[in-house]
Amino acid sequence: MALDIHAHRILILDFGSQYTQLIARRVREIGVYCELHPFDMDEDAIREFAPKGVILAGGPESVHEANSPRCPQAVFDLGVPVFGICYGMQTMAEQLGGKVEGSELREFGYARVDVVGKSRLLDGIEDHIDADGLFGLDVWMSHGDKVTKMPSDFHILASTPSCPIAGMFNDERAYYGVQFHPEVTHTKQGGRILSRFVLDICGCEALWTPSKIAEDAIANIRAQVGTDNVLLGLSGGVDSSVVAALLHKAIGDQLTCVFVDNGLLRLHEGEQVMAMFAENMGVKVIRANAEDQFLNNLAGEADPEKKRKIIGRTFIDVFDAESCKLDNIKYLAQGTIYPDVIESAGAKSGKAHVIKSHHNVGGLPEEMNLKLVEPLRELFKDEVRRLGLELGLPYDMVYRHPFPGPGLGVRILGEVKKEYADLLRRADHIFIEELRKADWYHKVSQAFVVFQPVKSVGVVGDGRRYAWVVALRAVETIDFMTARWAHLPYELLETVSGRIINEIEGISRVTYDVSSKPPATIEWE
């Protein structure tokens, strides 16, 4: 009998924290499957999920205010360990008989907590030991309220000068609460704390590994698809590439990929996709050269949102036209990943985390009367990358910087023209090439060039040149929700600028974008 990699599972209830997905990713990194659900998850569904432990995540509300979110009573009736983080600790305290109040001294950012209670959760975990033997942890705080009275059967776990009950525990029931965030990297021992809860206290086994995920996905694809044929839109991005590799391994020639070349790709990207999948792996790939169709449809349009819609509609038209030439296709594969399928405004109350769901190829499944196969729908992006390596995809492909679905169409400000796309492609290639040479490519999270439809005077040799302006953009981020502009060395920027201006006749000036997110976004459009 095949191993059930979902057998040991953790339930995470979301109260609206920006860090909730990070908790889920940390649990998965430990090697244990988990799911993220809104705080008002149906009680029957909680029992049916049968978790080996529950994590109550943080949130922006105040427990002592009317109609603030509460944890379903079923969680406390399951008889499994419960770990409350920030708001999760506060609602646990309130619901089990304690008290939460607003605090005049709010804690946001780094803090040191003293570990004052001996519990299974923090036993042997510390950053400091004082001369008097007191254990301390360096943590990340983000709270305005605090627990002022614990439930009767709890003990103080940790404290700070402004928050005497910064952690509480009941070892007998395996209930734990901390006011800090163990899921963020700023809490140095956060990974060990979560591992202690998930592996030791909940008793989970580390069944969720890339090799086992690959085996499970391949078995599920074969069971779902049988002998039917599958169609996949291959973009060359990480998600669709991993889906292609996974499907090819599972069903071989039953898979046909359509690669739509829209004329808005990176330099040599089309050739690289064909070489990797068609030539090296033997995947059936149809390349649809549709540059003229995309550029004609985009002609005269400068509005970013309208450009995105035109590109999306044109993709569907081209993909549909190519798929109509194929016989006996029953399934459409998509590179949908877990953040895509977390319900939009998932809580019945509308107070939980809101993430827009999406379909990678619009309404195609309905229009073409195809059934969907989505082998990555349980995985976060970092898990998709690790799965790609497990399947033998090259590191540089799997860890390539993100590229927007509309491609260069949203990196050319205003109207898209072939001339602009050709110039931008070459400039972007130079930037990425120099980042790799200087060993900076994997130090930044995303880097690209933006084409600005304005001209600037330059001097080349004895002559003046009136040509286009481009901007370099490089950012560092963990989650892409916030990002800092990358502090690249001046020498590197000088090399990139010099090469672009000297090698590309149509560009006379190079600028560097020093805007962080927020207030700016990472992409310009």
Curated annotation (Swiss-Prot):
Its EC number is 6.3.5.2. Residues 9-207 form the Glutamine amidotransferase type-1 domain. Residues 208-400 form the GMPS ATP-PPase domain. The active site is at C86 (nucleophile), H181, E183. One of its GO terms (molecular function) is ATP binding. Keywords: ATP-binding, Glutamine amidotransferase, GMP biosynthesis, Ligase, Nucleotide-binding, Purine biosynthesis. Pathway: Purine metabolism; GMP biosynthesis; GMP from XMP (L-Gln route): step 1/1. It catalyses: XMP + L-glutamine + ATP + H2O = GMP + L-glutamate + AMP + diphosphate + 2 H(+). ATP binds at S235, G236, G237, V238, D239, S240, S241. One of its GO terms (cellular component) is cytosol. The keyword Nucleotide-binding applies. Homodimer. NCBIfam families: guaA_Cterm, guaA_Nterm, PRK00074.1. Catalyzes the synthesis of GMP from XMP. HAMAP family: GMP_synthase (MF_00344). PANTHER family: GMP SYNTHASE [GLUTAMINE-HYDROLYZING], GMP SYNTHASE-RELATED. This is GMP synthase [glutamine-hydrolyzing]. It comes from Pseudomonas fluorescens (strain Pf0-1).
